[in-house]
């Protein structure tokens, strides 16, 4: 199994702007109604949900791709313009001894130049494409009426493109060397784009009703004044020029415009949450993306209906249950797994792990002066999963004889408390035992596990799959299109570590967010190490009390960058309101904690502030106090 560099691509930027033949139509595409609505869209989504790929698919480089062989008049109704902000350059347009007025006009000019350039390039590509019906009109189009704004604008399309390109280079030079260049260039107002569109409408028949939709990516990286400019454009958007934005969650922190108005949901724009749109579809959609890569790189026969992936009209066919089952089964075969009960069986066959299990049970019985001996338990020849959780049960406040009696019932297939005990404790006990023995835990393998670890992040899912395939390629154990479990577990641990350390790069607060992720993971790891497993699989938490402004800002950053995920609080002491937060499951293998959302821990607002802002001494004291508290609870815990 040989993988090439193209297989490793998991970011939109690695594909370029023309995605024809690479972009798989998402199952929610028809619901977006992007092609029908003239109201701006605010597209939100966590990292890896496909925001940039969606925008680039909607824009002219893809819709008028050289690889596309057939156009219809409908393709000309809406033309997309993609604009990803040059963040470092945009941030130069502030302060530096000048008031906001200069930099507001400078930023508007930058936007106008970029949008103009993209519209002109789109016209040129259509003119030079296989769609020749209106090539003559595009060859003959002139732009001399724009000379009312800039007298130097050339007449022809090709010369105009060069002119705008040079204007933008000179503008960049002026911004970068502002203090050394006294006179600033002519700033184009937004009406320049509107006049350009009017010329196109009046001179090329196929464009007479075209709406140009600008898609601004990574809105969250703009400074406040620049956000107000974009908000103003959104507020006043109307055909034939519509402005749309895409951003991470919690990024629409400024709603003001340059005037006294604010942008308001529904009235001024419609919000699209890609995480919600993917809900219920992620497993199959992510599988299709991976299978397309495999089809192109490894096995050309693995996708029987490849053309469906690029056809909007085939979405219904892809939603058929038989199709989805077929897709998922291919991935389950590629990334096999072991169930918790199968893993428990393997553990008792592993001499090192088995010895540790029986050693712990023996010590428990000795410490409790038990009448029941370890041999009594062994003679029952009970199922492996029962023995795996036995140490946790014996660590609780109880009589070993009661546990023995319940195990007898379970072994005889009678009604027994072991049924619930195994259900509630097996995964936590497996994790704890593998942690003690420093062995690779097979719970972190399998397609279904990859889906849970990725948590609707396509990039994370692809990285887990690619790294597993690469690990298998480098291993002595190879089987075409089937990655052995041990290779999967090695790969998952490496990906988890890489994703955790990547947090350092998450914006200007990255180092702080990384430290908080480490602290939260450490707290959950500490809970996992509790031998009694009194609260197994604690991977999410709630916060009681209101947070101060500083801590709330940090929490929002954690959510924005998907270090944490927020959901409505599940029932708590007959109260059903508030939020709870889950540490991103992709970090679970690093800390050897569960990736499942099972049990919640609770922090007070002061405790969460300490986790976010406390120094090392304060945090270590906090950990020690939690451990002491958990030990007291364990001593008091009864399993009956």
Go through each PLM region and give its residues.
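Long, compositionally biased intrinsically disordered regions
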Residues: 533-640
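Walker A/P-loop-proximal flanking segment of P-loop NTPase domains
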Residues: 1-84, 93-97, 101, 105
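Short amphipathic alpha-helical interface segments
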Residues: 503-539
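The conserved phosphate-sensing helix
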Residues: 454-465
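P-loop NTPase motor core
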Residues: 74-144, 272-290
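Walker B catalytic acidic pair
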Residues: 217-221
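The catalytic "switch" region of P-loop NTPases
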Residues: 192-210, 222-447, 483-513
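Conserved P-loop NTPase mechanochemical-coupling segment
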Residues: 133-192
